Amino acid sequence: MQPTLLLSLLGAVGLAAVNSMPVDNRNHNEGMVTRCIIEVLSNALSKSSAPPITPECRQVLKTSRKDVKDKETTENENTKFEVRLLRDPADASEAHESSSRGEAGAPGEEDIQGPTKADTEKWAEGGGHSRERADEPQWSLYPSDSQVSEEVKTRHSEKSQREDEEEEEGENYQKGERGEDSSEEKHLEEPGETQNAFLNERKQASAIKKEELVARSETHAAGHSQEKTHSREKSSQESGEETGSQENHPQESKGQPRSQEESEEGEEDATSEVDKRRTRPRHHHGRSRPDRSSQGGSLPSEEKGHPQEESEESNVSMASLGEKRDHHSTHYRASEEEPEYGEEIKGYPGVQAPEDLEWERYRGRGSEEYRAPRPQSEESWDEEDKRNYPSLELDKMAHGYGEESEEERGLEPGKGRHHRGRGGEPRAYFMSDTREEKRFLGEGHHRVQENQMDKARRHPQGAWKELDRNYLNYGEEGAPGKWQQQGDLQDTKENREEARFQDKQYSSHHTAEKRKRLGELFNPYYDPLQWKSSHFERRDNMNDNFLEGEEENELTLNEKNFFPEYNYDWWEKKPFSEDVNWGYEKRNLARVPKLDLKRQYDRVAQLDQLLHYRKKSAEFPDFYDSEEPVSTHQEAENEKDRADQTVLTEDEKKELENLAAMDLELQKIAEKFSQRG
């Protein structure tokens, strides 16, 4: 027992040593290991007292084990290093960018020490430099520029998704306040503006941001309209004193105006790439357009010399819509492209809130179209009103919506209507004016649609259904007055067919009545809809020139054959469930494509019935001699059978049993044929 255990132990050690040999030294040590194993096994088998392992073999095993441990240690270190590189390139890139930012502008380094959450978000979104993790350890291995941009973009998108919900209400609240300042900033910014100026003004902007956050938290519980009007007046007073700091302020709070300017100008490649990636998802959160709408909406008011109160009213009213309305679609876009808005709306006559349509339109082309808002002139406003006023007059003339259309037309031709319809009272615009304007913008250019809608209003849904029912069922109703009810819907060709098919109506009515009578006679669950065959109606309507006399003869023949002496074809089928209209199928040869199969089926059924009848007549001769009418051929057969044999022998009984078994088999085969046919 002991040598066996020793041998197994030595074999395991030898195999482990061979398997754990390094790849590099395998050729060198393979012979040594093999020789050691052979020596150990031979010694164990020959001498039980011999030493199990020689010193040379022990040295070889130690060397191989040491190589294995070194290899495992090296692999673990490499794995840890790779994991660290995969996990921490963002931190390394942040450290790299922080150092480069410090070299670019020293004033920015003061603000890195203790950034608040709001400042962190502002700096990450507006400037494009990542400083959320500035206090984390910085690695000395820097990845490439493309990897830096990808990692920073990923971290920005993740952080924005977490903080969007927290800051959504506050940012929507501040969008209306900064509309005028953002428009000023868009015109004051120059392509040559450097990053140092941005870093110098960042500290002042962060202080103003803190003040506004405090004011917002104190006044947010009050009513929406009072709160926004008060904060708008306060921001308008401060804008004159702090024009330099407010110039870049919308960039820090929202990050989009600045980032889109930089993406076009190409100041810094990595920063612009990160900002473009950062701002694209925000197009679909319904939060980028309000800033642009405030910019675009305030441009005309400032350039044309409007009072500041008028632009304030429009911006405050738009901000009051907040999360519910699409500001950009109702302010800037509508004033620039009113005809397109009308043409797109006309396809949706019943929609009451156009924000979904505008959303779909800006999803495709908003990013290209609004990077640099275009200033509008007096001529563009006048042309807009000239285009829109015919549709408003059509509004009043066509349906007499007096109050709303009068209110629209009574406004100033240029500025007043725009600020009233687009910014002054947005709720009224969405609820009432938009519905009418949408309808008649489409109808002014396409009166055909209005005619169709008027037709639909003149004929309610019930009337249309009644007319269709009368038109489809005129063959069974048989009333000539139905044609006069359909005079408006049929053209001259149908009216000519009316005179040609007057007589055909009565004949089809006659045949339909016969079919109904026969169906009710044989099917207790008769449904008249089964007999409304589209094939028959088509033949009646399209005048297939079939002979009515021939059809009448066929009906009378089939009527006689419903109860023949023994119509074996009928009794084999399922008369009360599936094949109630078998006579119709026999007439319509197109419905029975396999005539040979039909004949075979009929022969099998007839043979089955004959065998069944012979068996019954032999068992009950007196019963079958009753008054039941039978054919002459069957009578002759019965008389012959009764004359030849009155009592069946054993052989005859066996034959009858065999015939009955064959009968069952034939019935099964016939059912299979019928199912396939």
UniProtKB/Swiss-Prot annotation:
The cellular component terms of Gene Ontology attached to this UniProt record, alphabetical and capped at eight, are: endoplasmic reticulum lumen; extracellular space; secretory granule
Describe the processing and modification events after translation: Extensively processed by limited proteolysis at conserved basic residues. Alternative processing are seen in different tissues.
Q: Enumerate the subcellular locations listed in this protein's record, separating them with semicolons.
A: Secreted
User: Which superkingdom?
Assistant: Eukaryota
Q: In which tissues is it expressed?
A: Detected in cerebrospinal fluid and urine (at protein level). Expressed in the adrenal medulla, and in pheochromocytoma. Not expressed in liver.
Q: Name one GO molecular function term.
A: hormone activity
Residue numbers carrying Phosphoserine: 93, 99-100, 130, 149, 183, 225, 259, 263, 293-294, 311, 335, 367, 377, 380, 405, 533-534, 617, 626, 631
In the record, which positions carry Phosphotyrosine?
Answer: 401
Signal peptide residues are: 1-20
Please give the residue ranges the record annotates as the region Disordered. 64-463, 475-512, 622-653
Keywords (A to Z) from UniProt: Cleavage on pair of basic residues, Disulfide bond, Glycoprotein, Phosphoprotein, Proteoglycan, Secreted, Signal, Sulfation
Q: How does it assemble?
A: Interacts with ITPR1 in the secretory granules.
Question: What organism, scientifically named, is this protein from?
Answer: Homo sapiens
What is the protein's given name? Answer: Secretogranin-1
Q: Report the record's disulfide bonds.
A: 36-57
Q: Where is the composition biased (Basic residues)?
A: 277-287
For this chain, the family text in UniProt reads: Belongs to the chromogranin/secretogranin protein family.
Give all Phosphothreonine modified positions. Answer: 79
User: Which Pfam families does the entry mention?
Assistant: Granin
Region annotation O-glycosylated at one site: residue ranges? Answer: 116-120
Compositional bias, Acidic residues, is annotated for 262-272
Role description:
Secretogranin-1 is a neuroendocrine secretory granule protein, which may be the precursor for other biologically active peptides.
Please name the InterPro entries in this protein's record: Chromogranin_AB, Chromogranin_CS, Granin
| Keyword Nucleotide-binding tagged | no
